[in-house]
């Protein structure tokens, strides 16, 4: 709540009401504290329109101001440097010239076909948010109200979506072939694949498939990478034999990941990897990582009216030094 204090409480409050609030879809986003917030959902190119209501709580009071404005803001904030926020979108509409308010007032606003180039995101070290910001400019302290929105980026891909197929192993000890049905998956997709054991001369006790998220912030020597295991899928528990084939079926939607986000405004990236992990009887861990792309598929009714952003092909993943690679 934003208000200007008088002797007996707030003189006024600021409200922001969207014109299509009754019909516009609401989406959820998880904050850095783990709480879930709900806000109205927008796509790139959509207009943002509504009313700003200045509601007086104390009849007879006066509010002198040096102008009233509303801004549409797209902002990136790095948590390790909160003093250095970057605005990649800032549109301003002047609602009122300097003057005096003595009663409640409503102001219409509209930002036409607003460019929203990135998806809303809150991660371990970075937040990308969109919001409407109403400011009543005053001599000493401005009166400010922020109203958060959520933006989803929709992507389309050509029909060609190559499968991932690799043979990996440890010389004279283990040789396996794994295959995933695609290299790009939408957020409601299913990862389907199989593991085929060509040679088994070490005793494998456990095998699992992990969906790994890597959030990379900063550039150059100041780069920070946060790694999170989004999902684990147990492929087998026990020793495999030569010639054995084990199917994989991992439902992505159950883990609610974000899309792949690459080099967002030269501030951060979010990348996803499938990590195949094997554990032998001496508790040694072997792994093989393969990068995949996650993308947000457009509903049919949205496809006809929304601009899409084609994603870049992923770069070759780098091997981790934490565990021996297969």
From Swiss-Prot:
Low complexity bias: start-end ranges: 315-326
Which Gene3D superfamilies does this one have?
2.60.40.640
- Region labeled Disordered — which residues? 306-326
Q: What is its main location?
A: cytoplasm
Location in the cell: Cytoplasm; Endosome membrane; Early endosome
Mind listing the GO biological process terms from this record?
A: intracellular protein transport; retrograde transport, endosome to Golgi
Q: What does this protein do?
A: Acts as a component of the retromer cargo-selective complex (CSC). The CSC is believed to be the core functional component of retromer or respective retromer complex variants acting to prevent missorting of selected transmembrane cargo proteins into the lysosomal degradation pathway. Retromer mediates retrograde transport of cargo proteins from endosomes to the trans-Golgi network (TGN).
Q: Which family does it belong to?
A: Belongs to the VPS26 family.
Name by which UniProt lists this protein = Vacuolar protein sorting-associated protein 26A-A
- What's the source species for this entry? Xenopus laevis (African clawed frog)
Q: Source gene?
A: vps26a-a
